[in-house]
C-alpha cells in the first residue's frame, strides 16, 4: 500500500500542471465598405489582431514606466526652483539686515556728532551785579565752557547773557537743571540761543515825490532841495545842484542869492488871501502877493519867466527887500491856513500856497540862527 501511495504521489507530481485560464480573446469585427453603385464587392476577412500576452510581467513593467515617468519629469525642475527661492529669500533677508545695520550706524554717528558739537545758551533775568566769572562759575559744574558773555550798555548790565558749552549734551543738562532756579531773588531763564534773522525791511514812502513830509512843510524847511515834477519854480533844481557842487562853509548863502537873483513867479489871480496866526500881533490878513516884500511885475508873461528861471543877474534888485518887515515878525510865517474851504480850493490855490511858503522860507533863511557867520 505504501508503494502504491508513493507511486501515486510520484504520478501526481509527474502530471503536467494545468494551463492557466486564458481570457476571452476579442473577435475582430469585420469592416465593410458601403456598396458603391449597387455592385456588391468581394470582401476578404481581415486578419485577426494579435492576441496580447497577459501572463508575463512585461506589461506590468511597461505600465510602471508609463505611470512614473511623468512624475519623474515633473519632479526634476522642482528642485532648482525651490533652491533658487531659498537662495533669493536668504539674499533678501541679508540685504534688509545690512540696510538696517547701516541706518542704525548712520543714526548713531549723527547723534554722536550732535552731542559733541558746541551749543550756546541764552541766560536771562540774571542779577545785575553778575559778571562773566560769576556766570562761568554757575554753569561750569555741568561741563567745559568755551565762552561766557554778559551784555552791557552804558548804564551797566542788561540782565542777560550767553554761555557756550563745548558739548551739546552738557548744555542740555545745564539748561534742564538751572532753568527756573532763583538766584538772589531773581528767577533765571535758560533757553537755547537762536540766531536772530536780520531782514532788510524797506520802508514804503507814502508820498510819490520822495518826501517824507508833506510838500508845504518840505517847502518851508528845505526849499533848496524841493524839486518835484510840475513844481512852478525850476530855479530850485539849479540851486540845489549848485549847492551840492559848491564847497561852502556854514550855511550856503549862494543858494539864497540864486533865488533872489531869479525872477519871481507870475501873480496867480485865483490865489486868495491868507490868514497868518501871530501870537503878538493877532490875526493879520494879507491878500495875495501884493503885501509881500517882492514887488510883482504887472506886464510879465509866463513865457518870459520860463526863459529867465535860474538866471543870475549882475545886480541884486531884491537885496534891499530882505530887511525885517515893519508890520509882522518872522514868526508870523510859521502857521498859516487858507481862507477858502479845502473842497472848493482849486489847484491854483495850492500852488500859490506853496509859492508863498517858499518865499517865506527864503526870507527866513537870510536870518537863520544856525548860520555860523
UniProtKB/Swiss-Prot annotation:
<feature type="site" description="Interaction with RNA">
    <location>
        <position position="158"/>
    </location>
</feature>
<feature type="site" description="Interaction with RNA">
    <location>
        <position position="128"/>
    </location>
</feature>
<keyword id="KW-0508">mRNA splicing</keyword>
<dbReference type="InterPro" id="IPR017325">
    <property type="entry name" value="RBFOX1-3"/>
</dbReference>
<dbReference type="Pfam" id="PF12414">
    <property type="entry name" value="Fox-1_C"/>
</dbReference>
<feature type="site" description="Interaction with RNA">
    <location>
        <position position="196"/>
    </location>
</feature>
<keyword id="KW-0539">Nucleus</keyword>
<keyword id="KW-0507">mRNA processing</keyword>
<dbReference type="GO" id="GO:0008380">
    <property type="term" value="P:RNA splicing"/>
</dbReference>
<dbReference type="GO" id="GO:0036269">
    <property type="term" value="P:swimming behavior"/>
</dbReference>
<dbReference type="GO" id="GO:0007399">
    <property type="term" value="P:nervous system development"/>
</dbReference>
<dbReference type="Pfam" id="PF00076">
    <property type="entry name" value="RRM_1"/>
</dbReference>
<dbReference type="GO" id="GO:0006397">
    <property type="term" value="P:mRNA processing"/>
</dbReference>
<dbReference type="GO" id="GO:0043484">
    <property type="term" value="P:regulation of RNA splicing"/>
</dbReference>
<feature type="site" description="Interaction with RNA">
    <location>
        <position position="153"/>
    </location>
</feature>
<dbReference type="GO" id="GO:0005634">
    <property type="term" value="C:nucleus"/>
</dbReference>
<protein>
    <recommendedName>
        <fullName>RNA binding protein fox-1 homolog 1</fullName>
    </recommendedName>
</protein>
<dbReference type="InterPro" id="IPR034237">
    <property type="entry name" value="FOX1_RRM"/>
</dbReference>
<dbReference type="GO" id="GO:0003729">
    <property type="term" value="F:mRNA binding"/>
</dbReference>
<keyword id="KW-0963">Cytoplasm</keyword>
<dbReference type="GO" id="GO:0021854">
    <property type="term" value="P:hypothalamus development"/>
</dbReference>
<feature type="site" description="Interaction with RNA">
    <location>
        <position position="162"/>
    </location>
</feature>
<feature type="compositionally biased region" description="Low complexity">
    <location>
        <begin position="90"/>
        <end position="109"/>
    </location>
</feature>
<feature type="region of interest" description="Disordered">
    <location>
        <begin position="1"/>
        <end position="118"/>
    </location>
</feature>
<dbReference type="InterPro" id="IPR047131">
    <property type="entry name" value="RBFOX1-like"/>
</dbReference>
<dbReference type="InterPro" id="IPR035979">
    <property type="entry name" value="RBD_domain_sf"/>
</dbReference>
<dbReference type="InterPro" id="IPR000504">
    <property type="entry name" value="RRM_dom"/>
</dbReference>
<comment type="function">
    <text>RNA-binding protein that regulates alternative splicing events by binding to 5'-UGCAUGU-3' elements. Regulates alternative splicing of tissue-specific exons.</text>
</comment>
<feature type="site" description="Interaction with RNA">
    <location>
        <position position="129"/>
    </location>
</feature>
<feature type="compositionally biased region" description="Low complexity">
    <location>
        <begin position="24"/>
        <end position="36"/>
    </location>
</feature>
<dbReference type="InterPro" id="IPR025670">
    <property type="entry name" value="Fox-1_C_dom"/>
</dbReference>
<dbReference type="InterPro" id="IPR012677">
    <property type="entry name" value="Nucleotide-bd_a/b_plait_sf"/>
</dbReference>
<dbReference type="GO" id="GO:0003220">
    <property type="term" value="P:left ventricular cardiac muscle tissue morphogenesis"/>
</dbReference>
<dbReference type="GO" id="GO:0060047">
    <property type="term" value="P:heart contraction"/>
</dbReference>
<dbReference type="GO" id="GO:0005737">
    <property type="term" value="C:cytoplasm"/>
</dbReference>
<feature type="compositionally biased region" description="Polar residues">
    <location>
        <begin position="66"/>
        <end position="89"/>
    </location>
</feature>
<feature type="site" description="Interaction with RNA">
    <location>
        <position position="186"/>
    </location>
</feature>
<feature type="site" description="Interaction with RNA">
    <location>
        <position position="120"/>
    </location>
</feature>
<dbReference type="GO" id="GO:0000381">
    <property type="term" value="P:regulation of alternative mRNA splicing, via spliceosome"/>
</dbReference>
<keyword id="KW-0694">RNA-binding</keyword>
<feature type="domain" description="RRM">
    <location>
        <begin position="119"/>
        <end position="195"/>
    </location>
</feature>
Amino acid at each position: 500500500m505504501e508503494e502504491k501511495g508513493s507511486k501515486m504521489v510520484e504520478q501526481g507530481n509527474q502530471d503536467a500542471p494545468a494551463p492557466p485560464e486564458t481570457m476571452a480573446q476579442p473577435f475582430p469585427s469585420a469592416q465593410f465598405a458601403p456598396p458603391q453603385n449597387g455592385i456588391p464587392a468581394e470582401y476578404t476577412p481581415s486578419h485577426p489582431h494579435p492576441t496580447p500576452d497577459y501572463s508575463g510581467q512585461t506589461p506590468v513593467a511597461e505600465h510602471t514606466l508609463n505611470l512614473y515617468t511623468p512624475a519623474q519629469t515633473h519632479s526634476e525642475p522642482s528642485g532648482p526652483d525651490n533652491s533658487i527661492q531659498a537662495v533669493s529669500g536668504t539674499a533678501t533677508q541679508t540685504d534688509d539686515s545690512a540696510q538696517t545695520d547701516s541706518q542704525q550706524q548712520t543714526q548713531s554717528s549723527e547723534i554722536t556728532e550732535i552731542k559733541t558739537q558746541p551749543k550756546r545758551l541764552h541766560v536771562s533775568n540774571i542779577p545785575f551785579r553778575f559778571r562773566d566769572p560769576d556766570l562761568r562759575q554757575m554753569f561750569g559744574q555741568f561741563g567745559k565752557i568755551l565762552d561766557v558773555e554778559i551784555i552791557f550798555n552804558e548804564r551797566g548790565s542788561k540782565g542777560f547773557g550767553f554761555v557756550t558749552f563745548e558739548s551739546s549734551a552738557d548744555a542740555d543738562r545745564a539748561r534742564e537743571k538751572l532753568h527756573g532756579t532763583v538766584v538772589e531773588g531773581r528767577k533765571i531763564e535758560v533757553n537755547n540761543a537762536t540766531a536772530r534773522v536780520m531782514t532788510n525791511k524797506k520802508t514804503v514812502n507814502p508820498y510819490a515825490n520822495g518826501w517824507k513830509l508833506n510838500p508845504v512843510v518840505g517847502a518851508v524847511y528845505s526849499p533848496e532841495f524841493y524839486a518835484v515834477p510840475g513844481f512852478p519854480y525850476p530855479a530850485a533844481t539849479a540851486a540845489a545842484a549848485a549847492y551840492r557842487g559848491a564847497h561852502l562853509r556854514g550855511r550856503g548863502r549862494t543858494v539864497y542869492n540864486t533865488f533872489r537873483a531869479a525872477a519871481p513867479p507870475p501873480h496867480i489871480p485865483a490865489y486868495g488871501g491868507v490868514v497868518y496866526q501871530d501870537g503878538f500881533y493877532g490875526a493879520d490878513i494879507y491878500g495875495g502877493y501884493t503885501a509881500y516884500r517882492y514887488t510883482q511885475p504887472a506886464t510879465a508873461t509866463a513865457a518870459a519867466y520860463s526863459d529867465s528861471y535860474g538866471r543870475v543877474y549882475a545886480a541884486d534888485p531884491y537885496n534891499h527887500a530882505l530887511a525885517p518887515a515893519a508890520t509882522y515878525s518872522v514868526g508870523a510865517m510859521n502857521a498859516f491856513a487858507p481862507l477858502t474851504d479845502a473842497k472848493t480850493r482849486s489847484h491854483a490855490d495850492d500852488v500859490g500856497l506853496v509859492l508863498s511858503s517858499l518865499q517865506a522860507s527864503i526870507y527866513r533863511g537870510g536870518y537863520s540862527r544856525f548860520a555860523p557867520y
